[in-house]
Amino acid sequence: YEMFLDYSDNHPAACLNYDPSHFLLQQLDYLDFIRLYSERIKGVHVKDAEFRPTGRVGVYGGYQSWSGRAGRFRSLGDGQVDFTRVFTLLTEAGYNSWAVLEWECCVKSPEQGAAEGAPFIAKHIIETADVAFDDFAGGGTDQTQNRQILGLS
């Protein structure tokens, strides 16, 4: 990606649609990529995958059956992508755009994947806090109320 940015002179339109499943299948750190390039992420595909190498099949395992591949796409939550961390890092980076279900799975039916997909994404969307939990500490206190709560008055 850095070569692309170099060749485009870091053009502001040189942005991307982030898809953690492809990073996982390439054995790249999909979480670190968010940290490195969050300002370039303008869309997100919510898609899961798993990488299961064996003594016979790996990254360059040749053509295998859909379910026999070392790297394969899975329904959301059935693969190895840590979506809690993905959504947390995106939220912390200020991402506020689309999170689109992209589905392929070599095990489940499309109907089951679709039925599970929207609730899965909704469960991972993070509403950002408007205040810190300890913001109250900078405010004043009501001594009378505190004494009543403690049973001292």
Language-model segments: residues:
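A structural motif corresponding to the C-terminal end of an alpha-helix
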Residues: 11, 85-96, 128
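A short, acidic, flexible beta-alpha connecting loop/helix-capping segment that sits on the rim
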Residues: 101-109, 138
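Residues at the N-termini of beta-strands
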Residues: 43, 97-98
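Terminal-tail/helix-coil boundary detector
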Residues: 126-153
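C-terminal helical cap(s) of enzyme catalytic domains, especially alpha/beta-barrels
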Residues: 110-130
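Substrate-binding and catalytic surfaces of secreted/luminal carbohydrate-active proteins
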Residues: 77, 81-82, 89-92, 116
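Acidic/histidine-rich catalytic cores of soluble enzymes
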Residues: 1-80, 133
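A general structural detector for well-ordered alpha-helical segments in enzyme core domains, enriched
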Residues: 1-4, 33, 85-86, 116-121
